[in-house]
């Protein structure tokens, strides 16, 4: 029951937790007189409600409050709720309800209200609990948007799905489709605003799966708007009219329908046919830092903050699962290019952001393409090739620096074909260059700017909307390059964002995201590209069938990994099977996420070589050896050789084919030796001939007779009845004079089609890997140049189960290159893989440390899995952990912020280092804590996201970020970064700076 004392106000009360009423037989353990029969009914009073501040939601026009419900007190009747506006006492709302929450709509913005709540028995009410609030002075982004009805029934309205973007359920061409297997926020707006509570029921093809009480519009999640709002701007909310609820990833699949019911029994339904699901795509991004003839920069933020960046980028790309993995950095101290050039000091080329021979051959071709190929079981490719053998959605991003003829050059700014070359792994450079990998060009559709008709984004980890405009940039219109469209700023206050492929933005927009929010039209193109990628399921490659909404088998020539997503050693190098260019193996790089394959073993381990006398060839030799063949009547037959003696004593070596059934070497009936006009068949004695193995060294030859001498062999590859093999003489492939076929001397010019004049031994190439137990694994690699004008490159994964100590490359008996492998300490610093989505959720990013400053405790170590939670500052080109301790000089005590220095295992101090000291009476005093007696700083806190971190006593923490100075302090009244006035830099001046950065929680 609601009694209104103002006609200007409309009220609806919400049931956030559906109650079916109390059990009248129950009693309250907190109210002893309720069970005392001697106390008069008139004196009984129920418990006073306790209002839950955490579950309070306030917008500009509505409020939701919740309180502890009465646990079935005997004779419980209802709650009385009285709402009034402080500056207009006559506007009073009285609500009578049995539910322990209330939703009140149509309030006045920027006004102060008070709410009294009391619990009542049939005879008396408790004392009132009071809460006051001020409605917000905010802008609702979608407050004027008309309903696009897609929910039908007595509770009709509009439903929208929120994943990377706020989208319609039916699947439109200009926005992403719903992602199968990914969490979603559901927004529901009834056509008529008279509901006080809404229950959402989730149905699958098997029936009802779950029920969720929707949150009222005043409890809609917040946005990514910065906390320090400009005084000229208002708080912006996404909407003040949507009810919301979350659906977990495992219920998000085809066949789902949603039912919405209000407290009056009204029902609205969106059927499964109106909900279009797309593929549960997966994306793998490998990350590596490179230095070519120069030490790697060590500034790859994705690698340094793998957990945070993975979660952040997951919000921008329409996938069901995202995997970020890191490789150990590579310092190329010597470089061999596929053209044979060798660099030990600097490249002979001119380097630039977009140019340089090492940039192309090493960073892109060898490393990024190499890692991609290694994870598909491809062991080698041509040296300069950047071919993207795309099967799965696997991309390798690298940061790269090189020493060139014009000096040290940082590369960046390119992407595509499974490769990303970056200087900055944050902001638009990352989003833009990854976009090229998804098939996107510059200025998609002539240039895509967000606008009033494009959707907002969503961060599923922080549960906040991501605005499609710039929070801090001065308002201006966006004009497409073709001048065909002008997008004016929102409310003349906020400039709309450009898509990543149309300029994007190179700063953090809002309190959450460091990557660009894609325009929904562009996001759909990305989604269409991603859904074509295969995944490995049950030892097969599978692709998504959009008609069946299931994964189906994909036929492919690529190897299927025998182990997926395991720790690997990736071996990279350059080799020349022709032994013309120099070859080189590079120090291996390591990752915790890669694929292992059953790679081809060398034939030479079990294969015979050269000419083999048939009596010495056993069954296994025949099976394991690859034999040279020729075409006989459209069938490949083994080439053989034997000594022929004519009836009149002519002796020569004859090349024929093996008749395996009769165990002879023959030329068949079509080939004969003509002597004195008589045709003599040419065939060996039983089991008395030689077979020719592919394996060996050099060109293949034989001696037809003593007068001709050693000659190279040749054969015919013709489809008709002409066949045979012989020797090369002049410009012909021939046999001994007198050998005829079909009435003609067996002789053919070399330049005609079907004559094979190049026979060489295979000169098999092998990569040999020795582990610490001296076990050797041999892997076959191509024994020929894949491209004639360049060396090949090697790229393959092996297991990390046993450390390796030696790697060698052989072609035939020749060792082309080798490398001794030592322990790599960077393996311990690997953080990956970070897997986001599906059953993994955001577990890899959940905080493990307390928020803010915390005391060092026994056995605490800043390990890989938590170091992203700790605050850091740059000290002499290194990132050091921020710390704080109490410093005393006998006269006074103060807080000092420095950095952590490790003395030995499990022993740390907080220090100012060699450049910062405390000055007293012209004496410089070292700033250093006692051993393990200081505080660390944790910068992770979901609830404080975007809030500035305090130094102490409400002073804002500030940190220097330049090469010349270091340190941390607090902001003084003049907005300078300082510490105590007696803290000085080594130049004798007070530690006081006007250039700094503040730190916020994330």
From Swiss-Prot:
InterPro entries: Dictomallein, FN3_dom, FN3_sf, Ig-like_fold, Peptidase_M66_dom, TagA_dom. Coiled coil: none annotated. The active site is at 433. Residues 31-53 are annotated as: Disordered. It holds the Pfam family TagA. Its cofactor is Zn(2+). The keyword Nucleotidyltransferase does not apply. Zn(2+) binds at residues 432, 436, 442. Its main location: membrane. A lipid is attached at residue 22 (S-diacylglycerol cysteine). GO terms for biological process: proteolysis. Residues 282-536 form the Peptidase M66 domain. Residues 1-21 form the signal peptide. Binds 1 zinc ion per subunit. Keywords: Cell membrane, Hydrolase, Lipoprotein, Membrane, Metal-binding, Metalloprotease, Palmitate, Protease, Signal, Zinc. Gene3D superfamilies: Immunoglobulins. One of its GO terms (molecular function) is metalloendopeptidase activity. This is ToxR-activated gene A lipoprotein. It comes from Vibrio cholerae serotype O1 (strain ATCC 39541 / Classical Ogawa 395 / O395). The lineage of its organism: Bacteria, Pseudomonadati, Pseudomonadota, Gammaproteobacteria, Vibrionales.
């Amino acid at each position: 029951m609601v009694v209104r004392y103002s006609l200007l106000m409309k009220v609806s009360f919400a049931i956030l937790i559906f109650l079916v009423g109390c059990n009248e037989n129950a009693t309250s353990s907190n109210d002893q007189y309720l069970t005392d029969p001697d106390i008069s009914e008139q004196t009984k009073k129920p418990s006073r409600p306790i209002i839950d501040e955490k579950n309070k939601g306030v917008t500009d026009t509505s409020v939701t409050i919740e309180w502890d419900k009465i646990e079935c007190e005997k004779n419980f009747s209802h709650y009385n709720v009285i709402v009034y506006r402080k500056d207009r006492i006559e506007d009073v709302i009285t609500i009578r309800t049995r539910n322990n929450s209330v939703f009140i709509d149509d309030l006045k913005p920027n006004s102060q209200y008070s709410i009294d709540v009391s619990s009542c028995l049939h005879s008396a009410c408790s004392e009132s609990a009071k809460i006051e609030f001020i409605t917000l002075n905010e802008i609702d982004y979608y407050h004027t948007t008309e309903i696009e009805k897609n929910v039908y029934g007595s509770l009709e309205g509009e439903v929208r799905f929120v994943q990377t973007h706020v989208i319609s359920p039916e699947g439109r061409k200009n926005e992403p489709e719903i992602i199968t297997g990914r969490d979603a926020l559901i927004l529901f707006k009834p056509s008529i605003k008279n509901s006080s509570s809404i229950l959402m029921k989730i149905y699958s093809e098997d029936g009802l799966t779950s029920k969720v009480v929707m949150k009222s519009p005043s409890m809609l999640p917040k946005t990514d708007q910065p906390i320090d709002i400009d005084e000229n701007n208002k708080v912006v909310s996404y909407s003040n009219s949507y009810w919301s609820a979350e659906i977990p990833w495992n219920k998000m699949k085809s066949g789902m329908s949603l039912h919405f019911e209000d407290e009056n029994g009204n029902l609205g339904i969106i059927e499964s046919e109106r909900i279009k699901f797309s593929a549960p795509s997966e994306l793998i991004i490998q990350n590596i830092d490179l230095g070519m003839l120069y030490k790697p920069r060590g500034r790859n933020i994705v690698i340094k903050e793998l957990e945070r960046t993975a979660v952040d980028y997951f919000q921008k790309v329409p996938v069901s699962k995202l995997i970020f993995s890191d490789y150990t950095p590579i310092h190329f101290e010597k470089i061999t290019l596929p053209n044979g050039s060798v660099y030990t000091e600097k490249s002979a080329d001119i380097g630039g952001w977009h140019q340089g021979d090492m940039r192309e051959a090493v960073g892109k071709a060898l490393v990024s393409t190499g890692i991609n190929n290694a994870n598909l079981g491809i062991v080698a490719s041509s040296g300069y090739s950047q071919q993207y053998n795309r099967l799965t959605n696997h991309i390798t991003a690298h940061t790269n620096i090189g020493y060139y003829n014009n000096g040290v050059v940082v590369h960046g700014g390119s992407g595509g074909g499974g490769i990303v070359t970056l200087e900055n792994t944050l902001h638009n450079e990352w989003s833009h260059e990854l976009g090229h990998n998804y098939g996107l060009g510059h200025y998609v559709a002539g240039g895509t700017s967000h606008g009033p008709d494009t959707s907002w984004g969503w961060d599923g980890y922080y549960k906040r909307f991501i605005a499609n405009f710039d929070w801090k940039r001065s308002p201006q219109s966006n004009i497409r390059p073709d001048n065909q469209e002008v997008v004016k700023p929102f409310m003349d206050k906020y400039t709309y964002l450009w898509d990543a492929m149309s300029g994007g933005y190179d700063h953090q927009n809002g309190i959450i995201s460091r990557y660009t929010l894609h325009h929904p039209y562009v996001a759909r193109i990305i989604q269409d590209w991603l859904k074509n990628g295969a995944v490995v399921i049950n030892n097969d490659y599978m692709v998504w069938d959009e008609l069946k909404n299931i994964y189906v088998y994909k036929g492919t020539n690529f190897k299927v990994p025998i182990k997926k997503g395991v720790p690997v050693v990736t071996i990279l190098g350059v080799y020349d099977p022709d032994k013309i260019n120099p070859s080189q193996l590079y120090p291996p790089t390591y990752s915790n996420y890669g694929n292992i394959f059953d790679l081809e073993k060398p034939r030479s381990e079990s294969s015979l070589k050269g000419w083999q006398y048939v009596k010495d060839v056993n069954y296994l030799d025949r099976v394991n050896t690859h034999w040279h063949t020729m075409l006989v009547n459209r069938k490949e037959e083994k080439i053989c050789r034997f000594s022929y003696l004519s009836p009149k004593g002519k002796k020569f070596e004859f090349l024929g084919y093996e008749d395996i059934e009769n165990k002879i070497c023959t030329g068949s009936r079509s080939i004969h030796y003509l002597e004195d006009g008589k045709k003599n068949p040419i065939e060996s004695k039983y089991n008395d001939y030689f077979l020719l193995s592919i394996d060996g060294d050099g060109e293949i030859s034989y001696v037809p007779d003593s007068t001709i001498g050693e000659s190279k062999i040749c054969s015919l590859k013709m489809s008709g009845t002409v066949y045979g093999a012989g020797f090369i003489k002049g410009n012909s492939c021939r046999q001994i004079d007198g050998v005829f076929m079909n009435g003609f001397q067996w002789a053919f010019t070399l330049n005609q089609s079907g004559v094979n004049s190049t026979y060489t031994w295979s000169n098999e190439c092998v990569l040999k890997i020795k582990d610490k137990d001296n076990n050797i694994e041999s892997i076959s690699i191509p024994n020929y140049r894949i491209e004639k004008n360049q060396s090949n490159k090697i790229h393959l994964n092996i297991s990390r189960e046993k450390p390796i100590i030696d790697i060698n490359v052989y072609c035939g008996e020749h060792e082309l290159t080798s490398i001794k492998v030592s322990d790599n300490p960077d393996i311990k610093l690997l953080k990956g893989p970070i897997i986001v989505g599906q059953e993994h959720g955001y577990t890899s990013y959940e905080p493990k440390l307390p928020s803010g400053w915390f005391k060092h405790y026994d056995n605490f170590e800043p390990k890989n899995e938590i170091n992203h939670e700790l605050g850091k500052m740059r000290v002499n080109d290194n990132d050091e952990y921020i710390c704080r301790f109490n410093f005393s000089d006998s006269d006074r005590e103060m807080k000092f912020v420095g950095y952590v220095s490790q003395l030995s295992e499990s022993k740390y101090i907080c220090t100012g280092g060699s450049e910062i000291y405390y000055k007293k009476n012209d004496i410089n005093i070292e700033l250093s804590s006692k051993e393990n007696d200081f505080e660390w700083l944790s910068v992770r806190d979901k609830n404080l996201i975007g809030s500035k971190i305090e130094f102490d006593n409400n002073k804002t923490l500030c940190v220097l970020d330049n090469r010349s100075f270091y340190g941390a302090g607090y902001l003084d009244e003049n907005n300078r970064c300082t510490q105590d006035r007696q803290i000085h830099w080594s130049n004798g001046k007070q530690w006081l700076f006007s250039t700094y950065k503040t730190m916020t929680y994330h």
